[in-house]
From Swiss-Prot:
ATP binds at residues 12-19. This is Guanylate kinase. SMART domains: GuKc. Transmembrane segments: none annotated. One of its GO terms (cellular component) is cytosol. Keywords: ATP-binding, Cytoplasm, Kinase, Nucleotide-binding, Transferase. The keyword Iron does not apply. Belongs to the guanylate kinase family.
Amino acid sequence: MKRNGILFVISAPSGAGKTSLCRQIVDIFPDMRHSISFTTRPRRNGETDGVDYHFVTPEVFDTMVAEGAFAEWARVHGNCYGTALATLQEAREQGQDLLLDIDCQGAAQLKRNCPDDVFIFILPPSFEELERRLRGRNTDTAEVIARRLDNARREIRELVWYDYLIVNEDLPRAVEEFKSIILAEGCRASRIRSEAGRLFDIDMQDNSTI
């Protein structure tokens, strides 16, 4: 049954395993698209422009902000990240679900403007495990890790307004929980009510007795 595309907004502290989780979900749902954010962050080893991020200069990013090109944008860990408005509009119109992993600042902007979309927060099993994962990457200095841990405490406080919470202690289990959320939201009556009315030639205005 046809419906508009759903935006699944995913946030998590750095090191919670959000990227691994999202990659598996996109593999499971081939019709789902993973939105690629714009960033001023330097490209890391193994990252590809246009695949992991759209890497742009601060000057280009500022121009896009001034032109209203972003549905949301935020400064995180000293770098800017943003989601192109055109990407969201295109996915909705085509009925394509979109997976968007962004920080809490950007998610809050979208929550105010798109309250009917789905907001999911990913947690590590403990703060100690989060620190272990960050140190195990061997990509950040001690100063950067300390800043990420400090930011994590603030970010976790934001989970109260998210729709769902997944604790990523065991990745296969977290994937199953994520998959269940996607399937359930796709079947939500409010999303497919108008299409059901069209198929059965029924006025689906809320005339129920409940």
